[in-house]
């Protein structure tokens, strides 16, 4: 709920200006000071988007200020249309149309991985909130956003079930469930945890690597079932990656699957990358000769033809493309929007989708191998499972 100051005729213009600037910029008072009721430079007392000028306040429903919030949305994000319109001026654009000029006067942008939310897009704009309807967020320059007071959110776990189904469908297609094997899972978060459950249900042995979780479980005395990645590689018949793509920090994942790791693998091990392009060093993969299932590629959409021919199964970054996953992502986007702008946007209709389903992954692979130059078009045309 927003609080709008009442005012005398004498001060109305001044207070209106303060309010308008506050509602769009959320005055730059640090979180540390915000909840202490400190004054911003405009002499406005406030706490997390609520505002007090003088002693009198009246309640203002956010809909009354809907004209002040402009939102740019990737037109290919499903299930959002109609949800934000009561609260904002909404423009739906093709990914190629989301540019610095089109977002300049927007307060919020809602994108997918095709749009890079960086200085080139955001510099000089009014954008204060960036939302991506995806698990991955390496297309967002988070450092730039932090430095410029722009809040951002991704949708962790939204399509975890779909990616798990993708991995299971690939293993089924390759006939690997015919006997008991060992699967190594690198990254045991939303997706990796589901893959672990699936493999156990199939009767496979499971070994896992996740340094961040291992560190946490050690600190909380939960024991430690995690192994070093080299130890996982030495025993696994299948290694599947489910990490974000990171370049810095204690455990960067760029080219995590490199020549050294591949040398530690069994010669007949299968490598699966349905996480992010760049986690697997594709040149090293070719040199090693290991079989691979690849959904996420380096240099998308201009993928390597040689790697494409080498892959046992090759798809166009659609592992998480399920109706359920997209619906969950849109729900999460609305939740973030509501928290930021103090609105009450809801999904237009409630829908139910299957939680688990295998699919014909081979036909998708054949389509890409037959026309790799149409990577992006095939991805856009892919029918949600």
Can you annotate each of these PLM segments?
Residues 13-25, 47-48, 57:
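N-terminal amphipathic/hydrophobic targeting modules at extreme N-termini
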Residues 29, 45-48, 52-59, 63:
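Short, positively charged and aromatic/hydrophobic N-terminal segments
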Residues 61-106, 207:
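N-terminal glycine-/charge-rich "phosphate-binding" loop or analogous flexible N-terminal tail
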Residues 181-200:
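Glycine-rich adenosine-cofactor-binding loop
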Residues 202-219:
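NAD(P)-binding Rossmann-fold cofactor-contacting core
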